[in-house]
Curated annotation (Swiss-Prot):
It comes from Escherichia coli O1:K1 / APEC. ATP binds at R114, K155, S160, S161, G162, K163, G164, Q165, E195, G196, V197, V198, E203. The keyword Ligase applies. Its EC number is 6.3.1.21. The gene is purT. Involved in the de novo purine biosynthesis. Catalyzes the transfer of formate to 5-phospho-ribosyl-glycinamide (GAR), producing 5-phospho-ribosyl-N-formylglycinamide (FGAR). Formate is provided by PurU via hydrolysis of 10-formyl-tetrahydrofolate. Keywords: ATP-binding, Ligase, Magnesium, Metal-binding, Nucleotide-binding, Purine biosynthesis. It is an enzyme of class 6 (ligase). This is Formate-dependent phosphoribosylglycinamide formyltransferase. Mg(2+) binds at E267, E279. GO terms for molecular function: ATP binding; magnesium ion binding; phosphoribosylglycinamide formyltransferase 2 activity; phosphoribosylglycinamide formyltransferase activity.
């Protein structure tokens, strides 16, 4: 039996978000729908989820002592990481002391860096992956590239949103690629992964829920990447029944091996009927924002339902849908959005994240659309996103 308290009362059920961006904001809203008390934590003030939380704290989440202090102050029943850059060793300690880390501290630690999850997938679970090597010096990096061959991709083992990644076609790029990877790592300079390039027809995110009533799958989400970050996503991505079966089997093995209850974003390459594992996030995925309009339960609602120990039952997908990001480039601490009236309509919505500032290129919102076909849904979402005029 799941018992939920009432927020701001002595018996409240308390959820602490570690990372309070746009994904955390939607998780906070879903917690609020169930009367759960929300504490939002991030490294900067006025982060999106802080706008809809009961309380908030600004700390360096890579500082284990600072993390422990805020946990001891707030005494959450659930700790919900939204990002990779967290003191995961402290999360493991806190879990050993009885705290509930979502989905579990081991999953958070393994997926914090690409080495942990790649070794789990390829070496322990024997799943198909790209060829790969790890390196922690420029000389070893060059040896890894020579072994993998051209073209290849180098990524910091700890980074997100494409930071520090380079597609390498020739030896002339190696010095710059190494330096860029060192700058792009989330926790500072260090180790990289060199991956062989996989030939694929398309990439998908298979949003997979591990819950008290078993493992559930959303319809596959297709997406387009640019500069290492997603620009549009859509659902459902068409694929053969055999490829879908293989994708679900890979995702099932990965989430069960990681453990715990919650939603996982499993990234896969698909080539015909073949499926290759890429990465996994033990939390809602940015490409999954399309589920805000495409499903009866969004990825955020599913995550909350799962980690609270509630059954999922089933997931209803409404039909062709898409998301397109609102990604302006400017510098401002007083952002405004004009022409919004032309970005909404029947089966057409937007989400503006409420980020407090922008310095360069930053994702500030997303347009959501449904249509008779995926192609039309993508075009509707892209057009709507383009209608929003960001000023500052």
């Amino acid at each position: 039996m799941t018992l939920l308290g009432t927020a701001l009362r002595p018996a409240a059920t308390r959820v602490m978000l570690l990372g309070s961006g746009e994904l955390g904001k939607e998780v906070a809203i879903e917690c609020q729908r169930l009367g759960v008390e929300v504490i939002a934590v991030d490294r900067y003030a006025d982060a999106p989820a802080m706008h809809v939380a009961h309380r908030s704290h600004v700390i360096n989440m890579l500082d284990g002592d600072a993390l422990r202090r805020v946990v001891e102050l707030e005494k959450p029943h659930y700790i919900v990481p939204e990002i990779e850059a967290i003191a995961t060793d402290m999360l493991i300690q806190l879990e050993e002391e009885g705290l509930n880390v979502v989905p579990c501290a081991r999953a958070t630690k393994l997926t914090m860096n690409r080495e942990g999850i790649r070794r789990l997938a390829a070496e322990e679970l024997q799943l198909p992956t790209s060829t790969y090597r790890f390196a922690d010096s420029e000389n070893l990096f060059r040896e890894a590239v020579a072994a993998i061959g051209y073209p290849c991709i180098v990524k910091p083992v700890m980074s997100s949103s494409g930071k520090g990644q380079t597609f390498i076609r020739s030896a002339e790029q190696l010095a710059h690629a190494w330096e860029y990877a060192q700058q792009g790592g989330r926790a500072g300079a260090g180790r990289v992964i060199v991956e062989g390039v996989v030939k694929f027809d398309f990439e998908i995110t298979l949003l997979t829920v591990s819950a008290v009533d078993g493992v559930h799958f959303c319809a596959p989400v297709g997406h387009r990447q640019e500069d290492g970050d997603y620009r549009e996503s859509w659902q459902p991505q068409q694929m053969s029944p055999l490829a879908l079966e293989r994708a679900q089997e890979i995702a099932r093995k990965v989430v069960l091996a990681l453990g715990g209850y919650g939603l996982f974003g499993v990234e896969l390459f698909v080539c015909g009927d073949e499926v290759i594992f890429s990465e996994v996030s033990p939390r809602p995925h940015d490409t999954g924002m399309v589920t805000l309009i495409s499903q009866d339960l969004s990825e955020f609602a599913l995550h909350v339902r799962a980690f609270l120990g509630l059954p999922v039952g089933g997931i209803r997908q409404y039909g062709p849908a898409a998301s397109a990001v609102i990604l302006p480039q400017l510098t401002s601490q007083n952002v405004t959005f004009d022409n919004v009236q032309n970005a909404v309509g029947a089966d057409l919505q937007i989400r503006l994240f409420g980020k407090p500032e922008i310095d360069g290129s930053r994702r500030l919102g997303v347009a959501l659309a449904t249509a008779e076909s995926v192609v039309d849904a993508i075009e509707r979402a892209k057009h709507a996103a383009g209608q929003v005029k960001v000023q500052g």
